[in-house]
Amino acid sequence: MQVTVKTFAQTREITGEDNIALNLSKNSTIETVISQLKARSDKWALALEGSVLTACNQELCDLQTELSDGDELALFPPVTGG
């Protein structure tokens, strides 16, 4: 199955990528995607270290959410500031 991963803010700036198509095996979870992305390069590992807010098809979800073919996964860095 294929999913589209979208990145925003600091994650996009660090990786230099905004949309990525990933081929995954059936029953893959968001945690699987994050692990695969971290293994891609040091930039991805840095961008996804710590907590990441995730949304699947524009709904907030947790790391154990199973993905389906055609899903859109958005990865947001934690909100910071003061």
Residue ranges and their predicted role:
Residues 1-80:
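Ubiquitin-like/PB1-type beta-grasp interaction modules and other compact soluble beta-rich domains
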